[in-house]
Amino acid sequence: MTTENGAVVMRKIFRENLVGIFLLSCIALMANLAIADQANPIVIMKTTDGDITIELFADKSPITVKNFLRYADEGHFDGTVFHRVIPNFMIQGGGFTAVLEEKRTFAPIVNESRNKLHNTRGTVAMARTSDPDSAAAQFFINQRSNLRLDWSPGKDGYTVFGKVTNGMQVVDIIALSDTGPAQAMTARGPSVFQDVPVKPVVILSVSRLSP
């Protein structure tokens, strides 16, 4: 092989390597974009006791997350309170105003607790009645692990659809609120609630940090 032919071969190999590197870079970029598109939504919940950042598990609880974001986007949670607070258990909110009047909701959603996500400390789950498919707007944040609330064969659980990623100290502060009984107005009529914070803990807003 002459020196000239060798140079031609080397240039060809170099060009082929460049093309290969370019193609690999394009594939990697497309993969990263696909991952970004599939990323779970992040919301920030601003309360009178501080901010709570929550990742929503759209990949595991798509119906529940879509429902929660619908309420958030329409401002339903703004001005509602954590109306049920039990230390070493959970804090519940999303359904009542500061004067404990129940807000109107959309139709309830199907229970997704078969996703087998666990009610561990810091997770966010839907509140409901004894009817497993009765969840609407109310949710709770587990202050401790409450695995008895999970789905198991023959028993519907409470659907976990998110997790606190920042602000768990705020949840702990809320859980320590002084509580007592209070008169509430529900959709079914007057009722006395237990475990209501004496000083209302208000959700100022719930907004998206990422889609």
Protein language model annotation of sequence segments:
Residues 4, 9-22:
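Bacterial N-terminal signal peptides that target proteins for export
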Residues 6, 11, 29-211:
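Cyclophilin-like peptidyl-prolyl cis-trans isomerases
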Residues 19-31:
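Bacterial N-terminal signal peptides
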